[in-house]
Swiss-Prot record:
Binding site for substrate: 264, 321-323
Pathway involvement of the protein, from the record: Carbohydrate metabolism; tricarboxylic acid cycle; succinate from succinyl-CoA (ligase route): step 1/1
CC cofactor: Mg(2+)
Cited HAMAP family: Succ_CoA_beta
Gene: sucC
GO molecular function annotation: ATP binding; magnesium ion binding; succinate-CoA ligase (ADP-forming) activity; succinate-CoA ligase (GDP-forming) activity
Full protein name: Succinate--CoA ligase [ADP-forming] subunit beta
Chain sites annotated for binding ATP: 46, 53-55, 99, 102, 107
Free-text comment on the cofactor: Binds 1 Mg(2+) ion per subunit.
Gene3D superfamilies: ATP-grasp fold, A domain (3.30.1490.20), ATP-grasp fold, B domain (3.30.470.20), Succinyl-CoA synthetase domains (3.40.50.261)
Residue span(s) of domain ATP-grasp: 9-244
PROSITE patterns: ATP_GRASP (PS50975), SUCCINYL_COA_LIG_3 (PS01217)
């Protein structure tokens, strides 16, 4: 789960991480009142969406007068902000953060993420913070330092000093940097975050360290013990299809292709998408119906897939272990009739009650294309899309 920058900064304040004074605003009038309350003389008007790259996309503006605050708030609120993380359609800006300007002497990058490979938390930091960190990571990976933190030990002073010296924090500011790093790690640990990213973390002219941005991801499996974080959830920032799928215990992620996928098991779902790509197609979604699929769940899965107007064909790929093929077949037939399916449908089934499942599909009278292997299924669904062009 993601939250907005201003919400992340509320969390950081609770953990004694220095951040600029700021006030969220949901209208132009609120933005002006927020600026008046902060006092100025310089303010930053920041779009609040669940995506990075806002500055490059025109979603962050420096205002030096109330007129400019009003002007930029009017321009940004309601805009469809496009960044490298939003996709070509962008995201609508429904809220702003009005913040005091900062005396920036140096920008750093700092983040904490979970590293499953080492089963540790890893701090990644760089002396090259700011809007171009992605380019830095790609072209100069040596400028990104990593410090692995054993969760049984926690972040030590030695770890903090390695990070601070590695990114070039001045000697006089290292004690404060050490405190900030420790408090950031405590924020990450105590909130069950899977990512805390501060970009930029700044050195001010007075030598103080401050978090100028705040990006959080939280482990959804731990949200049950963090109602205060769940309260930050902004449904408007989430994919409507993914929200609908979660109501039926379906694991669904929207993609940019035109071939809908309905599969049981996350591993098989990913392999199915890879195979579609291998044979020249583009998957429109990841969809795992799990091991307890019913006719209702399959029907809802079809409805969710077909709400995406880009879907030109559907591939159902089922391995009958816990899930019986005849149950899925019944669900597919019911779903096709319920949604009045008009796009080509390819079904591949293997496993428990496979023959019975195939018979149910064959006897349905529906124009279902059958396949015996994953390669054959992918070939047929790609061909079906091409035929309908």
């Amino acid at each position: 789960m993601k939250i907005h920058e201003y919400q992340g900064k509320e969390l950081l304040r609770q953990f004694n991480v220095p951040v600029p004074n700021g006030i969220p605003a949901f209208s132009v009038d609120e933005a002006v009142k927020a600026a008046e309350k902060l006092g100025g003389p310089v303010w930053v008007v920041k779009a609040q969406i669940h995506a990075g790259g806002r500055g490059k996309g025109g979603g962050v503006k420096l205002a030096r007068s109330m007129d400019e605050v009003k002007k930029y708030a009017s321009e940004i609120l309601g805009m469809q902000l496009k960044t490298h993380q939003t996709g070509p359609e962008g995201q609508k800006v429904n809220r702003l953060l009005i913040e005091d300007g900062a005396d920036i002497k140096k920008e750093y990058y700092f983040s904490i993420v979970t590293d499953r490979g080492t089963q540790k938390n890893v701090i990644m930091a760089s002396s090259e913070g700011g809007m171009d960190i992605e380019e830095v990571a790609e072209s100069h990976p040596e400028k990104i330092i990593k410090v692995f933190v054993d969760p049984m030990v926690g972040l030590t002073d030695a770890d903090c000093d390695i990070v601070a010296k590695g990114i070039g924090v001045p000697e006089a500011s290292i004690p404060m940097a050490r405190d900030v790093f420790k408090n950031l790690y405590k924020t990450y640990w105590d909130t069950d975050a899977s990512l805390v990213e501060i970009n930029p973390l700044i050195l001010e002219g007075n030598g103080k360290i401050k978090a100028l941005d705040a990006k959080f991801n939280f482990d959804p499996n731990a949200l049950f013990r963090h109602p205060e974080i769940v309260a930050y959830r902004d449904i408007d920032e989430e994919d409507a299809a993914e929200i609908e799928a979660s109501k039926f215990d379906l694991a669904y992620i929207s993609l940019d292709g035109n071939i809908g996928c309905l599969v049981n098991g996350a591993g098989l779902a990913m392999a199915t998408m890879d195979t579609i790509k291998l044979f020249g197609g583009e998957p429109a979604n990841f969809l795992d119906v799990g091991g307890g699929a019913t006719a209702e769940k399959v029907t809802e899965a079809f409805k969710i897939m077909l709400k995406n107007k880009s879907v030109e064909a559907i591939l159902v790929n089922i391995f009958g272990g816990i899930m019986r093929c005849d149950v899925i077949a019944d669900g597919v037939v019911t779903a096709c009739k319920a949604v009045n399916l008009t796009v080509p449908l390819v079904v591949r089934m293997k496993g428990t009650n496979e023959e019975l499942g195939k018979k149910i599909l064959a006897d349905s009278g529906l124009p279902i294309i059958s396949a015996d292997s994953m390669a054959e299924a992918a070939t047929k669904v790609v061909a079906a899309v091409a035929k309908n062009k």
